[in-house]
Design a protein with these regions (language model features):
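N-terminal secretory signal peptides
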Residues: 1-14, 30
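N-terminal export leaders
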Residues: 14-31
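Intrinsic-disorder/low-complexity, polar/charged segments enriched in Ser/Thr/Lys/Arg/Asp/Glu/Gln
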Residues: 66-70, 133-135, 143-147, 195-199, ...
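Mature N-terminal segment immediately following signal peptide/propeptide cleavage
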Residues: 66-84
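Histidine- and aromatic-enriched segments that form or immediately flank copper-ligand environments
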Residues: 80-253, 317-343, 362-365, 369-377
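Low-complexity, Pro/Ser/Thr- and charge-rich linker/hinge segments at domain boundaries
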Residues: 256-267, 381
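Acidic-aromatic/histidine active-site loop/patch
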Residues: 264-302
Length: 381
């Protein structure tokens, strides 16, 4: 969604924070948090656990820093073309806009009171493009409270939406996940035009890269039929997390005092959309950050000597293999140049850039690469 430059300048907000290398969205932590029964910091600092595990829970107890990170986030619908240049840059295959355009829904960050959208900030401490797909990067440090003021302004579908986080601590009223047997749980189905405030807590095991996404009531997109009526698309009934399929997702980046600064940070979401769920599409699309195929997906840039970090997340039904040509990084298994991601998992990659050239990054599942998951990575000296 284009934003007027004057509005962007007026709404600019700087953000500074530290970053940390972590693979798998906090997977180095051995703790699995128990269910939380209260909303206060004191309650969250006293999780219930078996006494044999009490030392692990104590190590992960939420200890408030006194900082509250406030975000004003809005869900918005907009017409989105995933292949705006009309071609597959690897094979030369052409596309027309009617084959690759759909009504998307995305999260955008605003100034207080949803007054105006924040300016894009692609720096290593920034919120990202703030264009809707993906949503803004929500940054915090261990000990911080994240307070998200969410408003649903999905004017096209007018569906209820929510925000569900991974990796942070919260109680049921701040979960954002809708259940049919508990349909009136606050924050799980925020109606069109309404708002809700979520409160999340960053404990030591929250350090890393995590997704957040819509987890509201299942819906289906209707399509025109031969008799002039509208019926559900080829997939039939309501689709779970269809808001996330349409673009309602983003990254949480949680750091601590050990997190090193970087020169470049790249945010990358691997996701897909199917004609079975989105009838306006001519065929399935495999996307990076809402775009499919080279020059529609992000082109990332770095210089030799830069400390580079990739924060990568995947949503949908598929497993992916992230690969960057000409580069390696260290994982718990050793040095690698490809790593597997499943649905709702994350990967944080960090290295010092030492290999100039015009490279590509892509999903190494051939079907996904041919479906659009490929982009450029340009390194200069």
């Amino acid at each position: 969604m284009p934003v007027d430059p004057a509005t962007e300048d007026h709404c600019d907000r700087s953000r500074r924070t530290l970053l940390r290398t972590l693979t798998g969205g906090g997977a180095l932590a051995t703790l699995t948090a128990s269910a939380l029964s209260g909303t206060s910091a004191a309650a969250l600092a006293r999780p219930t656990a078996d006494t044999s595990d009490s030392h692990r829970f104590a190590a992960d107890a939420f200890r408030p820093s006194g900082r509250v990170r406030e975000y004003w986030i809005q869900a918005e619908s907009f017409e989105h073309n995933a292949v705006p240049n009309g071609r597959d840059g690897m094979t030369g295959r052409p596309f027309t806009p009617d084959q690759t355009t759909f009504w998307a829904v995305g999260f955008r960050a605003y100034t207080a009171g949803w007054s105006c959208p924040l300016k894009a900030d692609l720096g290593p401490q920034g919120i990202g493009s703030n264009s809707g797909i993906p949503g803004p990067v929500l940054r915090a440090e261990v000990g911080d409270v994240i307070r998200v003021h969410f408003r649903n302004m999905d004017e096209h579908y007018k569906w209820p939406h929510s925000m569900h986080p991974h990796g942070v601590r919260y109680d049921r009223s701040n979960d954002g996940a809708w259940l049919a047997d508990d349909p009136h749980q606050p924050g799980t189905a925020v109606p069109y035009g309404a708002s809700y405030t979520y409160t999340w807590f960053c404990s030591p095991s929250s350090v890393g890269t995590w997704p957040y996404h819509d987890h509201s009531q299942p819906q289906s997109i209707t399509a025109p039929s031969a008799d002039g009526t509208r019926k559900p698309g080829p997939g039939g009934g309501p689709v779970m997390e269809i808001g996330a399929e349409l673009g309602l997702f983003g990254v949480l980046a949680i750091t601590d005092q050990h997190t090193p600064q970087v020169d470049r940070e790249f945010i990358l979401f691997l996701h897909d959309a199917s004609p079975a769920d989105v009838p306006s599409l001519a065929h399935p699309l495999d996307m990076f950050n809402g775009g499919a195929f080279v020059d529609n997906t992000p082109t990332f840039r770095a210089k030799t000597g830069d400390r580079v970090r990739w924060r990568i997340a995947a949503l949908g039904n598929d497993f992916h293999v992230f690969h960057v040509h000409g580069h390696r990084w260290h994982s718990p298994a050793g040095w690698v140049d490809s790593q597997l991601l499943g649905p709702s998992t994350t990967l944080t990659v960090e290295y010092v850039e030492d290999n100039p050239g015009h490279w590509i990054y892509h999903c190494h599942v051939t079907e996904h690469m041919m479906g659009g998951m490929v982009g450029r990575y340009l390194v200069t000296e």
